[in-house]
Amino acid sequence: MGVVWRATDQLLGRGVAVKELPLDETLSATDARRQRDRTLREARALAQLSHPHIIVVHDVVEDDERPYIVLELIDGPSLADRITDQGPVDAMEAARIGIDLLGALRAAHTAGVLHRDLKPANVLLENGTDRVVLTDFGIARVSGATTLTETGSFVGSPEYTAPERMSGARTGPEGDLWSLGALLCTALSGESPFRRDSLGGVLHAVVVDEIRPPAQAGPILPVVRGLLERDPDRRLDADRAERMLRAFRETGRTPESAPPGLLPPDREPPRRRAPAWREETGGRPP
Protein backbone atom coordinates (compact mmCIF):
# COMPACT_ATOMS: atom_id res chain seq x y z
CA MET A 1 0.00 0.00 0.00
CA GLY A 2 2.89 2.39 -0.69
CA VAL A 3 6.64 2.92 -0.50
CA VAL A 4 8.22 4.16 2.73
CA TRP A 5 11.33 6.35 2.61
CA ARG A 6 13.73 7.34 5.37
CA ALA A 7 13.98 11.14 5.41
CA THR A 8 15.00 14.11 7.54
CA ASP A 9 12.70 16.83 8.80
CA GLN A 10 15.02 19.76 8.04
CA LEU A 11 13.03 22.20 10.16
CA LEU A 12 13.15 20.09 13.32
CA GLY A 13 16.30 18.13 12.52
CA ARG A 14 14.82 14.71 13.18
CA GLY A 15 14.54 11.51 11.21
CA VAL A 16 11.12 10.64 9.83
CA ALA A 17 9.53 8.06 7.58
CA VAL A 18 7.70 9.29 4.48
CA LYS A 19 5.06 7.05 2.93
CA GLU A 20 4.57 7.67 -0.77
CA LEU A 21 1.69 6.40 -2.83
CA PRO A 22 3.16 4.96 -6.06
CA LEU A 23 1.93 6.75 -9.17
CA ASP A 24 0.01 4.38 -11.43
CA GLU A 25 -0.48 5.93 -14.86
CA THR A 26 -2.96 3.20 -15.85
CA LEU A 27 -5.54 4.24 -13.26
CA SER A 28 -8.62 6.13 -14.31
CA ALA A 29 -9.21 9.53 -12.76
CA THR A 30 -11.82 7.99 -10.47
CA ASP A 31 -9.51 5.20 -9.27
CA ALA A 32 -6.61 7.62 -8.81
CA ARG A 33 -8.81 9.85 -6.68
CA ARG A 34 -9.95 6.83 -4.66
CA GLN A 35 -6.33 5.84 -4.05
CA ARG A 36 -5.49 9.36 -2.93
CA ASP A 37 -8.49 9.45 -0.62
CA ARG A 38 -7.43 6.12 0.90
CA THR A 39 -4.02 7.58 1.73
CA LEU A 40 -5.62 10.58 3.38
CA ARG A 41 -7.96 8.29 5.27
CA GLU A 42 -4.96 6.40 6.67
CA ALA A 43 -3.47 9.66 7.91
CA ARG A 44 -6.75 10.75 9.49
CA ALA A 45 -7.18 7.36 11.17
CA LEU A 46 -3.69 7.54 12.66
CA ALA A 47 -4.19 11.15 13.72
CA GLN A 48 -7.01 10.00 16.01
CA LEU A 49 -4.79 7.50 17.81
CA SER A 50 -2.23 7.98 20.54
CA HIS A 51 -0.66 4.81 21.89
CA PRO A 52 2.95 3.69 22.44
CA HIS A 53 2.41 0.69 20.17
CA ILE A 54 0.83 2.57 17.25
CA ILE A 55 2.91 4.49 14.70
CA VAL A 56 2.70 8.29 15.07
CA VAL A 57 1.69 10.46 12.10
CA HIS A 58 3.43 13.85 12.05
CA ASP A 59 2.04 15.47 8.91
CA VAL A 60 0.57 15.04 5.44
CA VAL A 61 2.00 16.97 2.51
CA GLU A 62 0.86 17.04 -1.11
CA ASP A 63 2.91 17.53 -4.24
CA ASP A 64 1.08 17.73 -7.56
CA GLU A 65 -2.01 16.24 -5.86
CA ARG A 66 0.01 13.26 -4.60
CA PRO A 67 -0.17 12.87 -0.81
CA TYR A 68 2.79 11.89 1.34
CA ILE A 69 2.34 10.80 4.95
CA VAL A 70 5.13 11.87 7.32
CA LEU A 71 5.44 9.27 10.07
CA GLU A 72 7.47 8.46 13.13
CA LEU A 73 10.68 6.72 12.08
CA ILE A 74 11.05 3.28 13.65
CA ASP A 75 14.62 2.01 13.39
CA GLY A 76 14.05 -1.71 13.14
CA PRO A 77 12.68 -4.54 11.03
CA SER A 78 9.15 -5.70 10.53
CA LEU A 79 8.10 -8.87 12.32
CA ALA A 80 7.98 -10.54 8.91
CA ASP A 81 11.61 -9.60 8.21
CA ARG A 82 12.69 -10.73 11.66
CA ILE A 83 11.08 -14.14 11.14
CA THR A 84 12.77 -14.44 7.75
CA ASP A 85 16.20 -13.43 9.07
CA GLN A 86 16.20 -15.04 12.52
CA GLY A 87 13.46 -17.65 12.43
CA PRO A 88 10.28 -17.93 14.52
CA VAL A 89 10.06 -16.53 18.04
CA ASP A 90 9.43 -18.54 21.19
CA ALA A 91 6.16 -18.55 23.11
CA MET A 92 7.31 -15.95 25.66
CA GLU A 93 8.25 -13.50 22.92
CA ALA A 94 5.04 -14.22 21.01
CA ALA A 95 3.06 -13.50 24.17
CA ARG A 96 4.89 -10.18 24.60
CA ILE A 97 4.16 -9.19 21.02
CA GLY A 98 0.54 -10.26 21.44
CA ILE A 99 0.08 -8.20 24.60
CA ASP A 100 1.48 -5.07 22.95
CA LEU A 101 -0.66 -5.52 19.83
CA LEU A 102 -3.77 -6.09 21.94
CA GLY A 103 -3.12 -2.75 23.60
CA ALA A 104 -2.75 -1.09 20.21
CA LEU A 105 -5.93 -2.70 18.88
CA ARG A 106 -7.89 -1.74 21.98
CA ALA A 107 -6.88 1.90 21.53
CA ALA A 108 -7.83 1.81 17.85
CA HIS A 109 -11.16 0.08 18.44
CA THR A 110 -12.06 2.50 21.24
CA ALA A 111 -11.51 5.33 18.75
CA GLY A 112 -13.73 3.60 16.18
CA VAL A 113 -10.87 2.44 13.94
CA LEU A 114 -10.59 -1.12 12.60
CA HIS A 115 -7.14 -1.95 11.23
CA ARG A 116 -8.27 -4.80 8.90
CA ASP A 117 -4.74 -5.67 7.73
CA LEU A 118 -2.91 -6.97 10.80
CA LYS A 119 -0.04 -9.18 9.63
CA PRO A 120 3.69 -9.60 10.39
CA ALA A 121 4.71 -7.15 7.64
CA ASN A 122 2.69 -4.40 9.35
CA VAL A 123 4.28 -4.84 12.77
CA LEU A 124 7.62 -3.13 13.43
CA LEU A 125 10.15 -4.06 16.13
CA GLU A 126 12.30 -1.15 17.26
CA ASN A 127 16.01 -1.87 17.60
CA GLY A 128 17.39 -1.41 21.09
CA THR A 129 14.01 -1.37 22.83
CA ASP A 130 12.16 -4.17 20.99
CA ARG A 131 9.11 -1.90 21.12
CA VAL A 132 6.27 -3.38 19.08
CA VAL A 133 4.66 -0.84 16.73
CA LEU A 134 1.52 -1.37 14.66
CA THR A 135 1.65 0.44 11.33
CA ASP A 136 -0.02 0.65 7.89
CA PHE A 137 -3.63 1.70 8.43
CA GLY A 138 -4.08 1.98 4.66
CA ILE A 139 -7.27 -0.08 4.53
CA ALA A 140 -8.52 0.79 8.01
CA ARG A 141 -12.22 1.42 8.47
CA VAL A 142 -13.09 4.47 10.51
CA SER A 143 -16.45 4.71 12.22
CA GLY A 144 -18.69 7.19 10.41
CA ALA A 145 -16.49 7.39 7.31
CA THR A 146 -17.64 6.29 3.87
CA THR A 147 -15.94 3.11 2.69
CA LEU A 148 -13.59 3.51 -0.27
CA THR A 149 -13.64 -0.09 -1.40
CA GLU A 150 -15.67 -0.82 -4.49
CA THR A 151 -18.60 -3.20 -4.14
CA GLY A 152 -17.46 -6.76 -4.73
CA SER A 153 -13.76 -5.96 -4.35
CA PHE A 154 -11.45 -7.17 -1.61
CA VAL A 155 -8.44 -5.50 -0.07
CA GLY A 156 -6.29 -7.04 2.61
CA SER A 157 -4.21 -10.16 3.21
CA PRO A 158 -6.36 -13.30 2.88
CA GLU A 159 -4.14 -15.48 5.11
CA TYR A 160 -4.84 -13.09 7.99
CA THR A 161 -8.43 -12.15 7.21
CA ALA A 162 -11.32 -13.29 9.42
CA PRO A 163 -13.83 -15.75 7.90
CA GLU A 164 -16.78 -13.41 8.39
CA ARG A 165 -15.03 -10.77 6.29
CA MET A 166 -14.07 -13.37 3.68
CA SER A 167 -17.75 -14.23 3.33
CA GLY A 168 -18.68 -10.60 2.76
CA ALA A 169 -20.22 -9.86 6.14
CA ARG A 170 -19.67 -6.53 7.84
CA THR A 171 -17.04 -7.01 10.52
CA GLY A 172 -16.20 -5.45 13.85
CA PRO A 173 -13.22 -5.50 16.22
CA GLU A 174 -13.42 -9.30 16.34
CA GLY A 175 -11.98 -9.41 12.82
CA ASP A 176 -8.72 -7.82 14.00
CA LEU A 177 -8.53 -10.34 16.84
CA TRP A 178 -8.75 -13.23 14.37
CA SER A 179 -5.88 -11.63 12.44
CA LEU A 180 -3.87 -11.49 15.66
CA GLY A 181 -4.42 -15.21 16.18
CA ALA A 182 -3.10 -15.96 12.70
CA LEU A 183 -0.18 -13.58 13.25
CA LEU A 184 0.80 -15.36 16.48
CA CYS A 185 0.80 -18.69 14.64
CA THR A 186 3.13 -17.22 12.02
CA ALA A 187 5.42 -15.69 14.64
CA LEU A 188 5.72 -19.06 16.39
CA SER A 189 6.11 -21.33 13.36
CA GLY A 190 7.23 -19.09 10.50
CA GLU A 191 4.11 -19.70 8.42
CA SER A 192 0.42 -18.84 8.54
CA PRO A 193 -1.79 -21.88 9.21
CA PHE A 194 -3.94 -20.70 6.30
CA ARG A 195 -1.21 -20.56 3.66
CA ARG A 196 -2.17 -22.46 0.52
CA ASP A 197 -1.07 -22.55 -3.13
CA SER A 198 -3.98 -20.48 -4.43
CA LEU A 199 -6.36 -17.76 -3.33
CA GLY A 200 -9.21 -20.27 -3.50
CA GLY A 201 -7.24 -22.61 -1.28
CA VAL A 202 -6.64 -19.85 1.26
CA LEU A 203 -10.33 -18.94 1.26
CA HIS A 204 -11.32 -22.58 1.85
CA ALA A 205 -8.75 -22.90 4.64
CA VAL A 206 -10.03 -19.81 6.43
CA VAL A 207 -13.73 -20.56 6.07
CA VAL A 208 -14.04 -24.36 5.98
CA ASP A 209 -10.93 -26.44 6.74
CA GLU A 210 -10.12 -27.69 10.22
CA ILE A 211 -7.92 -25.12 11.93
CA ARG A 212 -4.65 -26.63 13.09
CA PRO A 213 -2.45 -24.23 15.05
CA PRO A 214 1.25 -25.13 14.88
CA ALA A 215 2.79 -27.32 17.57
CA GLN A 216 4.91 -24.35 18.66
CA ALA A 217 1.72 -22.62 19.83
CA GLY A 218 1.29 -25.23 22.58
CA PRO A 219 2.24 -23.00 25.54
CA ILE A 220 -0.36 -20.39 24.55
CA LEU A 221 -2.69 -22.69 22.60
CA PRO A 222 -5.88 -21.66 24.46
CA VAL A 223 -5.29 -18.05 23.43
CA VAL A 224 -4.59 -18.94 19.81
CA ARG A 225 -7.61 -21.23 19.60
CA GLY A 226 -9.80 -18.60 21.23
CA LEU A 227 -8.71 -15.93 18.75
CA LEU A 228 -9.19 -18.31 15.81
CA GLU A 229 -12.77 -19.14 16.74
CA ARG A 230 -14.75 -18.84 13.50
CA ASP A 231 -17.88 -17.56 15.22
CA PRO A 232 -17.08 -13.92 16.05
CA ASP A 233 -19.61 -13.98 18.90
CA ARG A 234 -17.62 -16.75 20.58
CA ARG A 235 -14.17 -15.39 19.74
CA LEU A 236 -11.86 -14.55 22.62
CA ASP A 237 -12.11 -10.86 23.44
CA ALA A 238 -9.11 -8.56 23.77
CA ASP A 239 -9.26 -8.12 27.54
CA ARG A 240 -9.37 -11.83 28.28
CA ALA A 241 -6.71 -12.63 25.70
CA GLU A 242 -4.40 -10.07 27.29
CA ARG A 243 -5.01 -11.42 30.80
CA MET A 244 -4.25 -14.95 29.63
CA LEU A 245 -1.04 -13.90 27.89
CA ARG A 246 0.09 -11.88 30.90
CA ALA A 247 -0.58 -14.85 33.18
CA PHE A 248 1.57 -17.02 30.91
CA ARG A 249 4.37 -14.43 30.93
CA GLU A 250 4.28 -14.27 34.73
CA THR A 251 3.99 -17.98 35.50
CA GLY A 252 5.23 -19.82 32.42
CA ARG A 253 2.15 -22.02 32.65
CA THR A 254 -0.30 -22.58 29.82
CA PRO A 255 -3.45 -20.47 30.39
CA GLU A 256 -6.72 -22.20 31.16
CA SER A 257 -8.46 -23.42 28.03
CA ALA A 258 -11.93 -22.20 29.01
CA PRO A 259 -11.63 -18.87 30.82
CA PRO A 260 -14.80 -17.68 32.58
CA GLY A 261 -17.09 -15.67 30.33
CA LEU A 262 -15.71 -17.00 27.06
CA LEU A 263 -19.11 -18.33 26.03
CA PRO A 264 -21.72 -15.77 24.99
CA PRO A 265 -24.55 -15.24 27.48
CA ASP A 266 -27.00 -17.53 25.70
CA ARG A 267 -24.53 -20.41 25.84
CA GLU A 268 -23.42 -20.11 29.46
CA PRO A 269 -24.61 -22.87 31.81
CA PRO A 270 -27.90 -21.87 33.43
CA ARG A 271 -27.78 -21.00 37.10
CA ARG A 272 -29.63 -23.46 39.30
CA ARG A 273 -32.34 -21.83 41.31
CA ALA A 274 -32.91 -22.95 44.89
CA PRO A 275 -36.12 -24.98 45.39
CA ALA A 276 -39.12 -22.97 46.53
CA TRP A 277 -39.21 -24.80 49.84
CA ARG A 278 -35.67 -23.73 50.60
CA GLU A 279 -36.62 -20.09 50.06
CA GLU A 280 -39.81 -20.33 52.14
CA THR A 281 -38.46 -22.33 55.09
CA GLY A 282 -34.96 -20.88 55.35
CA GLY A 283 -33.36 -24.08 54.10
CA ARG A 284 -35.31 -26.62 56.23
CA PRO A 285 -37.34 -29.25 54.38
CA PRO A 286 -41.09 -28.93 55.01
Question: Where is each model-derived feature located?
Answer:
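AlphaC helix of the eukaryotic protein kinase fold
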Residues: 22-48
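Proline- and threonine-rich low-complexity intrinsically disordered cytosolic regions
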Residues: 24-29, 124, 187, 191-193, ...
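Conserved short submotifs of the Hanks-type protein kinase catalytic core
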Residues: 64-78, 82
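Protein kinase catalytic-loop region centered on the HRD/HxD motif
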Residues: 101-113
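Conserved catalytic-loop aspartate of Hanks-type protein kinases
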Residues: 176
